């Protein structure tokens, strides 16, 4: 694997971890809370953001305005049955979601969830490292590169891995602070 490929793959893993973090409630209204919720629409699972305009009115309220009014009920139902613990209010045209402040217990649950997402991201990085190191060893075995070059490349791969793992840990600590902030 080339250096650029490795960094690109690792960057994608960090971005995926960040997207997972964005779906965790922090007690503040945020449109990305709804990113993981899909709705059955004309026989296909469709993300809410594809069916409606989502905006935050203030720090506690999210507004969802469906492009097609007939999808209002299904969007409301999907939000109700989600694991977000929020209740949508439907006024016939717009769905409003009041995001209540989080309880201490719920904050701790979300911190655990953030840690789980961070660990998944680190595992993905380690898998990328393993694949890259295996390729280096294979190239060395086939005589394509010398033992010294292989070892240098493996050390470089480890440096990338350490860099990106520390980046995930930084993002995790930021997210935990955001969750625990009252």
Swiss-Prot record:
GO cellular component: cytoplasm
Source organism superkingdom: Bacteria
Claim: ATP-binding is one of the keywords in the record: no
GO BP of this protein: translational termination
Keywords: Cytoplasm, Protein biosynthesis
CDD domains: RRF
Molecular-function annotations in GO: ribosomal large subunit binding
Compartments in which it is found: Cytoplasm
InterPro entries: Ribosome_recyc_fac (IPR002661), Ribosome_recyc_fac_dom (IPR023584), RRF_sf (IPR036191)
Pfam families with a match to the protein in the record: RRF
SUPFAM superfamilies: Ribosome recycling factor, RRF
Record function comment: Responsible for the release of ribosomes from messenger RNA at the termination of protein biosynthesis. May increase the efficiency of translation by recycling ribosomes from one round of translation to another.
Entry similarity comment: Belongs to the RRF family.
Protein name: Ribosome-recycling factor
Naturally occurring in which organism (per UniProt): Prochlorococcus marinus subsp. pastoris (strain CCMP1986 / NIES-2087 / MED4)
Lineage, broadest ranks: Bacteria, Bacillati, Cyanobacteriota, Cyanophyceae, Synechococcales
